[in-house]
Each structure stands twice: as structure tokens, then as C-alpha cells.
Amino acid sequence: MNQDHPEFDSEDLAQNPPETDPLKAEIESLRSEIALVKADALRERADLENQRKRIARDVENARKFANEKLLGELLPVFDSLDAGLTAAGTQPSPLRDGLDMTYKQLLKVAADNGLTLLDPVGQPFNPDQHQAISQGEAEGIAPGHVVQVFQKGYLLNDRLLRPALVVVAKQD
């Protein structure tokens, strides 16, 4: 036992630890509260940033595919013009030339709005863009490649609008 300073008696300290300072306890409590508030603020900031990105992506997709319905309804018009050109043959005539110019202008306007024509003759069959309606034999075309196109397909900004209806070369 320390007679000069009884408050420093090691036996007494071991048995009765000094009470923690109430200010220290409050400081620790406030520090943990600050840590929680900071974590919440970071989480909210991340959520807000994710929401901004999602909204920007949705706006971009809405802009890219705003014409989808209109262009989809024009596909039968493209088919009719293409069939008319095929029926008109290759002989030049004012009617055929006018039909050809109209078809090309319409395709250009559609392409300027993100439409891409799929005319896959001779290309490998792609189930993501083509719909096989039959198999056939064709000289000079490898098996698994498109022999004939019954109906052209279309992509709108790299998303399939309508698959091409095709005949695929038979496997040996």
C-alpha cells in the first residue's frame, strides 16, 4: 500500500477500477453515432448515383427505341416494295425506277433512325437473327449457311425487330 498517495495503491486499483470519465463515454458514443451517419450518407450517395445512372440509361433507351412501333409497322411496306421490285424484273422502266428510288429513300430514312436490314444469303445461320423455315440443298453454299431468304429481317439499334425467314443448307 502506498502511504503517501493512497489513490495510486495498486491493490486498490486492481479491485476497484476507476470510474470512466462520463465525457469520454459521451465522446465514444458520439463517435460511433458519427460513423453510423457517415455510413448512411455514403449509402444514400451511392443509391442516388445508381438511380441517376438508371434514369440516364432509361432515357437513352427511350430515345433509341422511340421509333420502334412506327418502323415495325413500316416493315410490310418494305416487303411490298421489295416484292414489287422483284416482280418488275431487271428491265428498266420509269415505273420500276420510281419504285426503286422510293424503296431506297425509305430504307435510307429508316437506316438514319437506327434500322438495319438483314439479308443473310450465304452467311452462317444465326439463330439470334434468323428463323429457319426449311433446309435445302444449294451448290456452292456451305452446310449451315443461308441458301435463300423468304422475308428479310431487321435490327433496330442492334436489337432484333424481326428475324429473317430463311432456308438453311443441309448438313452432309
Swiss-Prot record:
InterPro entries: GrpE, GrpE_coiled_coil, GrpE_head. Coiled coil: none annotated. It comes from the Bacteria. GO terms for cellular component: cytosol. One of its GO terms (biological process) is protein folding. Its main location: cytoplasm. Residues 1-24 are annotated as: Disordered. Keywords: Chaperone, Cytoplasm, Stress response. It is found in: Cytoplasm. GO terms for molecular function: adenyl-nucleotide exchange factor activity; protein homodimerization activity; protein-folding chaperone binding; unfolded protein binding. Pfam families: GrpE (PF01025). Homodimer. Participates actively in the response to hyperosmotic and heat shock by preventing the aggregation of stress-denatured proteins, in association with DnaK and GrpE. It is the nucleotide exchange factor for DnaK and may function as a thermosensor. Unfolded proteins bind initially to DnaJ; upon interaction with the DnaJ-bound protein, DnaK hydrolyzes its bound ATP, resulting in the formation of a stable complex. GrpE releases ADP from DnaK; ATP binding to DnaK triggers the release of the substrate protein, thus completing the reaction cycle. Belongs to the GrpE family. This is Protein GrpE. It comes from Xanthomonas oryzae pv. oryzae (strain KACC10331 / KXO85).
